[in-house]
Each structure stands twice: as C-alpha cells, then as structure tokens.
Amino acid sequence: LDAGREILFISNADNLGATVDPVILNYMDEFNIPFLMEMTAKTPADVKGGTLYQQDGKLKLLEIARVPDDKVDEFCDQKKFKVFNTNNIWINLVALKDRLSQGPLELTVLVNRKNVGETPAVQLETAIGSALECFEGAVGLTVSRDRFLPVKKTDDLLLLRSNLFTLNKGQLKMSPQKKHLPKIELGEFLQNIENFQNSLPIIPDLINLEELKIDGEVRFEGTASLKGKVHLNGLKKPLILPSGAVITDESLQG
C-alpha cells in the first residue's frame, strides 16, 4: 500500500496459466471487489477440486477433505458442481487491511491423511480460498481453462510443450481445434526429467490425440504424430520410434 499498489494477485507456483490479467484487474477496481476467486469448468481430471456454494448470502469454499465419505460421489458430479477453484486469488489490499483491523482471518483448516514412505501422517493446511468468507462482496469468477495449467508431472509438461498450446504475449493459449485436453499417462521412466528430455527431443503432434499411455523406455528419434488412443510399451525392451512416425489407435511394444 505504501508503494501505491492496492490489488494483490496470488496463484500456485506450478500454474503456468496464472498471469496478471488486466481485464480482471480492471473488474476488481471498477466494482470495488474485496476478494475474487477464479473458477473454471471441471473436467474428469478435476472432479475433486474445491467448489463454491452460497449460504446465508455468503460465498463459501468447499474442499473435498471436508466432504463426508457418503457424499463424495455427489461432490464429484460434474453436472451438480460444474466449476472448481483454480487457486488464482485477487485481493484488494485496502479491504484486507480494514478486515485485519477487526481481527485475524478465520481460515478453514483441512485435514489430509497420507503416507510418508510407510509412515501414516496427518497434514494440516489452511485454504487461502476460504478467506472469501471473511469479505462482504467476495466474488467467484468463471474463467477459461487457459488460466489453469498446472505442471505437477511430466504428463502435464508434455501437453504444454506440444502443439496443443501456443504462447501469446506471455499467456499460454490452447488450440481452438481442441475442446478438451487428451488424457496422458507417462510411466515411471518418463517421470524422470532427464529421461523425458532424452526420449522426446521433439514433442509429437498431439492435435488429434485422445489418450496416450507410455510404459517403460520409449524413445522418439524425431517428429511424430499420435492420433486417437495410443499405448506404447517399452517395459521388456526399449521401443524406438523412427522420425516421421504416425501412430493411430495402436498399441506398440518394444
């Protein structure tokens, strides 16, 4: 605030689609919105993502960790909950300062049970998105899928490096030829970034791909085009694909 900045934009570090959008910034300023959460349409890969609901005139965030076991299927129903939280958050710092003068934000604590190696563990975390409950006039804004492009595995990296995306003024844009991204499942060998780089020196054409599963050591020697549903298996013996290969609805083994 002392530097004259009144709007803060926060996003997950792995979300390559999260850029400062001047249109959203102007919307925040013009309508004096204190807190804004970007939402986007669910796909089968996002059914567990947190969603918004309204109670007593206030927007609230519901994360799957707070959903009873017998209601999880309902929570994951794309027809009932059509959008989910991208964790792209915009906050008006003047409104935040005013709110903090009234006391600390009461953020929802999530309990996640997981294993660290073979040791059961309980991870406690607070969801920044739950802060929207603390602001009168908070907004959930549905945005295009281009603003939610997380890279957590090489599966995601393959998609973003392919011809499914172009870079326009610092923003990744999905090809207009695709409505949904293909399903990618790369095995343990290709989860290693060095193996990934060596095995895919040139990313194949994925425009007409629906599903890709790669097991074991598979290497592309040059350009290639993958179409439909493709399964490449190099578990028993490395599978080497020559430059110019076109693979359509096939299952190949090394």
Annotate each predicted stretch with a short phrase.
Residues 1-5:
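Active-site nucleotide-sugar/metal-binding loop of Leloir-type enzymes
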Residues 16-18:
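A short, conserved beta-strand element in the Rossmann-like catalytic core
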